[in-house]
Amino acid sequence: MNRQLPARPSLAQLENEVEELRRGAVSPGDAQLMLAREYGFASWSKLKHHVEGMEELENRVERLREEFARGDIETKKRLLKPAHDQRRFENYDPSAGSISDRDARLLIANEEGYALWNKYESFLHLDPDVRDVIAAVQIGDLERLKEVLQANPSAANPSWVPGFAAPRPAPNDSIPLFCVSQAVFDGLNQRGNGYEITQALIDAGADVDTEGGHPLTAAVSFGALRVAEALIDNGAKVDGVDGDGVPMAYAMHFTFREIAELLARRGAKLDVRFAAGLGRLDIVKSFFADKGSLKPGSGALADPFGLERKQKGQSVFWCERTPANILSQALYYACIHNELQVAEFLLSQGADINAIVPGLDIQATILHRVAALGVIEPRTRVLNFLLEHGASLTVRDLAFHGSPVGWAYYCNRRDIFDLLIDQAGIHDLVRFDRIDRLRAVLEENPQLARSCDARGLTPLHYLHGHLKHAQEIVDVLIAHGADVNARDSAGQSVLETVNRMGTPEMVEHLRSLGATLETTGRS
């Protein structure tokens, strides 16, 4: 049995152990090799390289903590800048006197491109040959990849240094076949050799269906068409390892049409939702009974992110397979893939164009999703189709309470924003400073000045500090009957909201019109 390295190994300690072995009349080279093999490494150079890397990591953690502790607030803000998600930190605070060991490690992981510390820790403890494989994969260096694999074919699959308790399931970026697709998507490998890189790994023994089918899931999620082809050519299961359609769900949701077509050509199963996304109207119609009801199995295949859900022990279905839910998803896939003939048919069968589409990660309507995807000619056609068939610009998503116009704006889809803004609801006209359009809308329907959104917010609640026409907006709303002391569903007044989101000038103007700042809540 191999000896285990300590959690924080020291090269100096290893060199002392080499000296101990040399006392038995062993040559320096033999002593180093003996020690390396005791710890499960093929050579002294690999053991030394691993330990030096771990020592440098510990030094880096210590340097970061010391610099943070003695730095001013601007230094601390700079040090915290690489953070991916502040919510993952114990204490993300540039005014804090120190940063914890845990937060320092997470910050370093984020700086290296890893969302979580355990993912970066896993990478650091990979077998050195596996790390060399991943390094070659990431830049598309086929010659170097073949060289490493020829010396150690087992490096085509993830393995870790002895004594390291690898997380389960294996982090995706510790899997060489996953890294092929990620490198294509991130633009690290621009050599166009994704197929050849994948084939070299498979020829060396890489498992095409490892970790529940992660390699093909990665290829379809990252839009790596040639990688997907290589995997399928070598036996990757086109419907996923459990035959539940997980790969197609990713391709559909992420709008990788070429990959969806590839999966279908290679025999992937289609339910009514996937057939709708592929424009297979004949197949779509085959799922309806004579009286228009959906047949059993119409929504039999997975929702997006099925692999992640299975890894957590959950079902691949995010939502109940009711007729309304199945129709909503089918309409969603048809629209984001520009299959408007299919969409027309689904609407005739009762699909709700303004439903919050179930079973997805976005908790929004189809119009929200299309507005965020960006404007190319097919998107414009879909937008016009949706609006002509009654899609609402005032429905708000459940996570961020944004409208489709807001989604276009925050996703920087300015062409779509410009197309939609003049048709937007009154709340968005206030939010986006459209004073001229606001006047016209209120002249036509003054009652809108007092209208409320789903959270009870009036147009006045949408005032904020970046408006150039704030006073004019307030005045025109008041002139058409807006209540300067209106409260939202949580009991918050207009003035409370503007006091938080607006400017002192806006607050004073509202006060001059009779607004009062009272305690939140209703009696």
Per-region residue spans from a language model:
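Extended repeat-based scaffolds of very large eukaryotic assembly and lipid-transport proteins
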Residues: 58, 66, 124-197, 280-282, ...
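Ankyrin-repeat boundary/"N-cap" motif
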Residues: 127-135, 158-186, 209-220, 241-252, ...
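Alpha-solenoid repeat scaffolds
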Residues: 155, 162, 183, 187, ...
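Conserved ankyrin/ankyrin-like repeat signature
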Residues: 144, 193-197, 226-227, 258-259, ...
